[in-house]
Amino acid sequence: MVARAAMLVLILGAGVDMAVDDIENRDLVIVTVATNRTDGYRRFERSCKLFNFEVRTLGMGQGWKGGNMAYAGGGWKVNLLKEELEKMKDEVNTIVMFTDSYDVVVTAGKEALLSQFDTFGSKIVFGSEGFCWPDSSLAKSYPEVKVGKRYLNSGGFIGSASNLYNMLISGGESRGK
């Protein structure tokens, strides 16, 4: 996977839900999709435990239904996330950090992650990357950026549970099972 060295901001309305000084009044939940307890997943799990994060792993024990690197197939992952967020759809004080897990380790605690999130001044922040995948013909549709990478990466984003849920339901049903 491409390292997420930069963040691309997706602004969904003005301002943020909570002030920076309200970090202690917010919960931070980490959500991921993984089907097997690989070495990479166990490493991710240990890093989350080290910082006392609640981790919700979706899809564990199921066969992978998210496609492969040859073509797009993220609909299954999105639908699992949508189901999980529906349980939290009214929780404006719960911040959800959705991330890949097989190639990720958490290196900071709640205060540092929420402080960094707050510095963007946006309700939802996505990771970004230098490649337009899986459909490079969409590259021209992405705006130019002054800092960081240009293309959204679904392997890392953060926002309140309610804002993420509303974003996902506004797009209709996701392709893929």
Question: What annotation goes with each model-predicted range?
Answer:
Residues R42-R46, M60-G61, G109-A112, I169-G172:
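Short coil/turn segments at secondary-structure boundaries
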Residues L80, V125, G156-I158:
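Conserved hydrophobic/aromatic beta-strand scaffold that supports enzyme active sites
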Residues S101-Y102:
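Short acidic donor-binding/metal-coordinating loop in glycosyltransferase active sites
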Residues R150-K177:
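Catalytic core and acceptor-binding pocket of nucleotide-sugar-dependent glycosyltransferases
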